[in-house]
Amino acid sequence: MWGLCKNHFPSNKIQVQERNKALKPKKSGSEHKTKQLFPVFNCKKKEKGVMIRFAILRNANTSLLSARSICLFTQAPTYCHVRLNTLNKSITTKRNSLTESKRHVHDGKHFFTTPHQQQQTKLGEIEEGHSPNIKGEDLRSIGQAITHQRNKRRKQIWSAIFGGIFGVILGYSLIYRVIYLKEQSFLPLFPSSKIRKLSTRDLKKVDVNQVQKLSKLRVLEILSGHDMIKEQYGVPLLDKDGNSPTLNEFSMWCEDQDPCVTGIVMEPDDKRDSSHTWYRIPFVCKWRITHRPISIRGTIDDLLNRIGLETADLFEIISPERVYGSFKYEYPLQGDSHALHLWFHGEIELDDDSLIVYNGKYHVDVKLQEIDLFRREKNGQLIQYVLYKNEAGDK
């Protein structure tokens, strides 16, 4: 019998027998007997249903319930269908797992945000109707965030380095040397010029008036023997009023022989009187700002003495000639372990258009370095005449 299970099925025994007679094919006897004994099921896929071919014994009593059971059995999925569905499900599961794993991969783009949050932001903007250049804005914001984080990290590292160095130096200078050892400590801050003005304490040790008088006498002595001064101004040298020339300006300063630094001197707070002006931290220390030279030779000697050596063990220093004007015979300030050059500068006015300018050094006696005459000529030009210069002097 040929029947379409989806659309039609025989409802009684008589219709089944008549249908079998009409559709009975003419075949050999052996083949016909075999098909009467064993029903044959052959499934073919079509667009609207499944065509089922089955044979039923002519004398068999088949009820409607049994026929419907046969139809339902034939419509059940075959092994091929089950296998195909299993493969499709496994492939779909693998694809979903790969997609989920890719979502959780942390790359440089999602350094501060997760892909899930970024996807929600994009969906929200699209739903609201906004369509900006999301990719460019994200890249710029991420780049700015990374740059800000690097700069912040760099500042933290440098702050830690400088803070550690400052803490070590301050701890050694203040806590160890001043508080523990009860000694004076010097903390250098920045380099300073070797030339500086005399402090109030230094001026107390130098007789400025004596230097001023001696320098004026030495200048007048040299000018009186100069040919140009004899011819144009005469001897003895007088000013425009016919009196002895007077000093219009005189100043002094000092020059260290070694490089100098400006720093802080700290001592224990012993409340003793001192000629310096101190700032006090009660019960801790007192401090002031001062200038100090850096003696390279003295530093080397100190390092060698700490390891049990002396300078003479490594090299021999031959002292230069004791020539007047060298640092060997310069003016040492009391309480200082280094020598200083004491320089002076003065001006003497001869008339309205002539001015004598000189400078030199002082050590027990005055030593002039240079004497110049500044004169305004009739054509209005200001000309400098070098009247005296000590070529052997050290400036």
Swiss-Prot record:
- Entry GO CC: mitochondrial membrane
Looking at the UniProt entry, the stretches that span the membrane are 156-176
Membrane topology of this protein? Single-pass membrane protein
Q: Is Transmembrane helix a UniProt keyword of this protein?
A: yes
Q: Which subcellular locations apply to this protein?
A: Mitochondrion membrane
Which controlled-vocabulary keywords does the entry list? Answer: Membrane, Mitochondrion, Transit peptide, Transmembrane, Transmembrane helix
Q: Hey, what's the signal peptide range on this chain?
A: none
Keyword presence, Secreted: no
Q: Which cystines does this chain contain?
A: none
| Taxonomic superkingdom | Eukaryota
Grouped into one coarse class, the protein's main location is mitochondrion
The family line of this record is: Belongs to the AIM39 family.
Supply the name of the protein: Altered inheritance of mitochondria protein 39, mitochondrial
Species in which this protein is naturally found: Saccharomyces cerevisiae (strain AWRI1631)
Designated gene of the protein = AIM39
